[in-house]
């Protein structure tokens, strides 16, 4: 009977010690997997951030193109017809009713001040 008890005790001690080792290994594996998961999340976060920055750059580029196209048209040079209500004559020019050569056109032209 003593041999059965000794054998049972030996098996019990081995099972407990090996079980503890497995438990420690499992804990280590879980920590490694958690660290890998964090690195994957960091990688995914960086990738998403990069995509968002590219999208933002494209949107800002489109906005700047719109503002470039919506700016005021170029100024009108000397001797060119202009609108009395919305003169776009270049600096140094004034939108005036013509004298002599343009009287019959009934339009305003850009002239020097």
Curated annotation (Swiss-Prot):
Localization per Swiss-Prot or TrEMBL: Secreted
Signal peptide per UniProt: 1-21
Entry superkingdom: Eukaryota
Major localization class: secreted
Pfam families the record matches: Toxin_22
GO cellular component assignments: extracellular region
Family matches, as InterPro entries: Toxin_22
Keywords: Disulfide bond, Ion channel impairing toxin, Knottin, Secreted, Signal, Toxin
Propeptide residue intervals: 22-74
Tissue: Expressed by the venom gland.
S-S bonds: 75-90, 82-95, 89-110
An annotated Gene Ontology molecular function: toxin activity
Stated family: Belongs to the neurotoxin 14 (magi-1) family. 01 (HNTX-16) subfamily.
Protein role: Probable ion channel inhibitor.
Recorded domain comment: The presence of a 'disulfide through disulfide knot' structurally defines this protein as a knottin.
Name assigned to this protein: U11-theraphotoxin-Hhn1a
Organism: Cyriopagopus hainanus (Chinese bird spider)
